[in-house]
């Protein structure tokens, strides 16, 4: 079967077609980074309007890339939440409309389940059970995963997500939006140990995170030490090391608590090379395995939605023709497949 996936939850328009026998047949992506750069962050109204302009042309491009026509599509999956309500409504409206016109099922997909399942698109997909670290601009969560829809939240950020903290700290360092990848690049030139940032909430039991204090610590460090290039790089290094160490410490605890031997890392921040290297080293010492998607599937994309839609469709999930989205949607509320 072939599923068309539509992703419009924030500032990327992603369209993909997934075949359960042949794999990914098409993958189209348009990023709105340049549109929002002057504002230092995503402007919801601008994001929604740009999705309106880009979604249908990208669907046409995906069909052309795959060599398919509408008659070859067996289902349409779309991100129904969580995300920006206006952006979600664009994808949901287009998805439901196409499903009606093509007389195929419409499948609402949870955005974070899409991220969680993105490593399944790789040649060496993880087997259940595993601990999942979902780490992005909007979420930082540790989840026990024993099957599709069998998700137990172990811990999450009580304030800023890790990706949000990266972007905010990057802005303090004078970097453009989105600053997370630029901060990591700057950190590679930094001197380890010149500055030492705290590892929030690692001195107490539990698996929750807190990253807002690191931004404040960075602001104070910048104020007290100036902004020459090397100092900025050293601060970036200290910040990144603190975030990576914190995530690693919490992952260790989650693995100890569950007894699982596999760790899956997903979401935009999972593309961070330092984080990947540290977690790979940690899992090697534990004689376990770590899995993640290729970098282009770490950030928002249509491929993960098409794949998650296929999984949910096979489990019997479909929707009526009403258009509804859930800007806030806990992952634990999803039914088991």
From Swiss-Prot:
InterPro entries in the record: ATPase_NBD, Gcp-like_dom, KAE1/TsaD, Peptidase_M22_CS, TsaD
Biological process, per Gene Ontology: maintenance of translational fidelity; tRNA threonylcarbamoyladenosine modification
Post-translational events: Can be proteolytically processed in vitro by TsaB.
Annotated keywords: Acyltransferase, Cytoplasm, Iron, Metal-binding, Transferase, tRNA processing
Residue sites binding substrate per the record: 134-138, 167, 180, 272
E.C. designation(s): 2.3.1.234
Reaction equations catalysed: L-threonylcarbamoyladenylate + adenosine(37) in tRNA = N(6)-L-threonylcarbamoyladenosine(37) in tRNA + AMP + H(+)
Primary location recorded for the protein, binned into one broad class: cytoplasm
Disruption phenotype: Appears essential for growth, since no null mutants can be obtained. Conditional depletion of this gene prevents t(6)A37 modification, and leads to pleiotropic phenotypes including increased or reduced cell size, unusual distribution of DNA around the cell periphery, nucleoid loss, and membrane/cell envelope defects. These phenotypes could be indirect effects of severe translation defects. The TsaD depletion phenotype is suppressed by overexpressing the response regulator RstA.
Cofactor: record remark: Binds 1 Fe(2+) ion per subunit.
Keyword Lyase carried by entry: no
Keyword Mitochondrion in record: no
First-tier enzyme category under EC: transferase
Subcellular locations according to the entry: Cytoplasm
CC per GO annotation: cytosol; EKC/KEOPS complex
Subunit and partners: Homodimer. Interacts with TsaB; may form a heterodimer with TsaB. Also interacts with TsaC.
Family the entry assigns: Belongs to the KAE1 / TsaD family.
Record function comment: Required for the formation of a threonylcarbamoyl group on adenosine at position 37 (t(6)A37) in tRNAs that read codons beginning with adenine. Is probably involved in the transfer of the threonylcarbamoyl moiety of threonylcarbamoyl-AMP (TC-AMP) to the N6 group of A37, together with TsaE and TsaB. TsaD likely plays a direct catalytic role in this reaction. May also be involved in the metabolism of glycated proteins, but does not show sialoglycoprotease activity against glycophorin A.
Protein's UniProt name: tRNA N6-adenosine threonylcarbamoyltransferase
Organism: Escherichia coli (strain K12)
Lineage of source species: Bacteria, Pseudomonadati, Pseudomonadota, Gammaproteobacteria, Enterobacterales
Gene giving rise to this polypeptide: tsaD
């Amino acid at each position: 079967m072939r599923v068309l996936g539509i992703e419009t939850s924030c500032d990327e328009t992603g369209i993909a077609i997934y075949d359960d026998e042949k794999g990914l047949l098409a993958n189209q992506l348009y990023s709105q980074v340049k549109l929002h750069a002057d504002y230092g962050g995503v402007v919801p109204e601008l994001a929604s309007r740009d999705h309106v302009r880009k979604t249908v042309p990208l669907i046409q491009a995906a069909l052309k890339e795959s060599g398919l026509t509408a008659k070859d599509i067996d289902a349409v999956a779309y991100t129904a939440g969580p995300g920006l309500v206006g952006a979600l409504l664009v994808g949901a409206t287009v998805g439901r409309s196409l499903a009606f016109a093509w007389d195929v099922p419409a499948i609402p997909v949870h955005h974070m389940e899409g991220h969680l399942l993105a490593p399944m698109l790789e040649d060496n997909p993880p087997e259940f059970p595993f601990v999942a670290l979902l780490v992005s601009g909007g979420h930082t969560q540790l989840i026990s995963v024993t099957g599709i829809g069998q998700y137990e939240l172990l811990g999450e950020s009580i304030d800023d997500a890790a990706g949000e903290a990266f972007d905010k700290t990057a802005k303090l360092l004078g970097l453009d939006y989105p600053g997370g990848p630029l901060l990591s690049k700057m950190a590679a030139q930094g001197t380890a140990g010149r500055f030492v940032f705290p590892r929030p909430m690692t001195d107490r039991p539990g698996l929750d995170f807190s990253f807002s204090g690191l931004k404040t610590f960075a602001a104070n460090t910048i104020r007290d030490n100036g902004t020459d290039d090397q100092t900025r790089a050293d601060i970036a290094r200290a910040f990144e090391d603190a975030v990576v160490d914190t995530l690693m410490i919490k992952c260790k605890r989650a693995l100890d608590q569950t007894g699982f031997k596999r760790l899956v890392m997903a979401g935009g921040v999972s593309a961070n090379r330092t984080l990947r290297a540290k977690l790979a080293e940690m899992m090697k010492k534990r004689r376990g395995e770590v899995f993640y998607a290729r970098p282009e599937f770490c950030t928002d994309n249509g491929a993960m939605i098409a794949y998650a839609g296929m999984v949910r469709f096979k489990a019997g999930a479909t929707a009526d023709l009403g258009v509804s989205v859930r800007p806030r949607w806990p992952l634990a509320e999803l039914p088991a497949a």
